[in-house]
Design a protein with these regions (language model features):
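Conserved ABC transporter NBD signature motif
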Residues: 29-43
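Conserved ABC ATPase "signature" region
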Residues: 76-93
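Conserved ABC ATPase signature
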Residues: 97-101
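Catalytic Walker B motif of ABC-type/P-loop ATPase nucleotide-binding domains
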Residues: 122-125
Length: 201
């Protein structure tokens, strides 16, 4: 399933994403994953958080190195990394330094890293921010592809177009609280829910 966590800036979307990933500790309440209460350290690796600022997360010398950083490298794992790059349409850039990729390609590479670590839940924070139309469509297509591979994807966004492009369900936040939780069946429903002006947009 691909879920959009939507709402204006400052409503706590990124904070919730970081809490789910175990990067921040909740001040109250509890996080339940797979039917069990999970402490922050228990969520690490199960929930993979991809931040908006990807450059601060790129450490590899090339794309293959980026995917295998932090995992035990074996011939099987190297082959798995190559297959992921192929699936994400990045194999032709395998020898390039990650910093030389476009914004959309970096997003796809970050998805590949999450796949290498076998995280069942992937959170993307504003994955299409700053991307042109072509790259936005490419990233959205890859997100949908990953969902079909059995991953749960949470897309944090304030962009209705991004949510419509790849998400099946939307959860709307306002002032840190959930105000709506609904299936996306078409543009009219989502745009009406978030108060998006269709004539202007």
């Amino acid at each position: 399933e691909v879920i959009a966590l939507i709402g204006p800036n400052g409503t706590g979307k990124s904070t919730i994403g970081r809490i789910l990933a175990g990067l921040l500790k909740e001040k109250s309440g509890e996080v339940v994953l797979f039917g069990k209460h999970c402490r922050p350290k228990d969520r690490l690796g199960k929930v993979w958080y991809i931040p908006q600022d990807l450059d601060s997360q790129l450490f590899g010398e090339d794309l293959l190195d980026e995917l295998t950083t932090g995992v035990e490298v074996s011939p099987e794992r190297k082959k798995a990394a190559e297959e992921i790059l192929e699936a994400l349409e990045l194999m032709s850039f395998v020898k390039q330094h990650p910093s030389t990729l476009s914004g959309g390609q970096k997003q796809r590479l970050a998805l590949g890293v999450a796949l290498m670590h076998e995280a069942p839940i992937i959170i993307l924070d504003e994955p299409t921010s700053g991307l042109d139309g072509t790259n936005m469509r490419n990233v959205s297509r890859m997100i949908s592809k990953l969902a079909k591979m059995g991953r749960t994807i949470i897309v944090i966004t304030h962009d209705a177009e991004c949510a419509l492009a790849c998400c099946e369900r939307a959860i709307r936040l306002e002032n840190g609280c959930i105000t709506d939780d609904f299936q996306i069946r078409g543009a009219e429903l989502l745009l009406d829910k978030i108060g998006y002006d269709k004539k202007e947009g």
